[in-house]
Amino acid sequence: MAPDGKRFVYRTFGPDGDGLKIMNIETNAVAMLTKGYDNFPLWSPRGDLIMFSRLAEGDYDIYTIKPDGTGLKRVTHSHGNDAHQAWSPDGEQIVVASSRMGFKDEGVYTDAPQPYGELFVMRSDGTDVRQLTDNQWEDGTPAWQPAGK
């Protein structure tokens, strides 16, 4: 949902095309934002960017794009899958679930799913990356605590 509450972004897969779309809640008008295997779209707290995960070069990486469809930028360049991202309340940082560190043997032997692996925090432009978790199981779907709570 856009911070103004008037639009939302969602992914679509199907015969009409794959990608992200934006719908105006008041008019039901729909606009195609991206084309491709894009997923997990999230509006920035300031409303100026939409962050999403895109399948490119065999792995998922995090991208941002302006709501008008301009300014596409690749944020992560890992050799693993990056997804399940979340904005910090001020929009200055993101947290991402990633398999960039590889998989642990324990998951292979126990049939435990490890599609993403560990959590990483970074600036919203992809710099200053810090690993937050390191364990034998998957850590994923992070969420920030709301500001001031």
What are the functions of these language-model segments?
Residues 31, 72-73, 129-130:
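A structural motif specific to WD40 beta-propellers
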Residues 114-115, 126-149:
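Blade-level signature of beta-propeller repeat domains, shared across WD40, Kelch, NHL, RCC1
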Residues 24-28, 66-70, 123-127:
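Short loop/turn segments that connect beta-strands within beta-propeller blades
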Residues 3-4, 45-46, 89-90, 146:
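Residue-level detector of Asp-centered blade-edge/turn motifs that repeat once per structural unit
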Residues 11-20, 34-35, 53-63, 67, ...:
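A flexible loop/linker signature enriched in serine peptidases of the S9 family
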Residues 40-42, 84-86, 141:
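Conserved beta-strand position repeated once per blade in WD40 beta-propeller domains
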Residues 5-8, 47-51, 75, 94-95, ...:
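Hydrophobic beta-strand positions that form the internal "hydrophobic ladder"
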